[in-house]
Amino acid sequence: MSFRLARGSTMLLRRAAGLRIECQAGTVWLSAYRHPDDSVLQAGESIIVDSDRDVVLSGLPDAQVALMSQVSQPLELLP
């Protein structure tokens, strides 16, 4: 699944364990619930969520983002 994340908009990914988040264009800021460190992905970079936390994504500025499940569970996306 791929989508555009406009500057300043956010998306909540619920229970994101095993999800690969790839920034295809622009820059994406990621913050995981109760995780001390945030991450910033530039175009071409990706990260795999290693815990069952909720993750918030934000475009800095606009970004193109791809989500790929590494486990067999449905993705639940909330704007």
Language model segments and positions:
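C-terminal structural segments of small proteins and small subunits
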Residues: 45-79
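Short, glycine/acidic-enriched capping/hinge loops at junctions between secondary-structure elements
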Residues: 32-34, 69
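Short loop/turn motifs at secondary-structure junctions and domain boundaries
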Residues: 11-13, 30-31
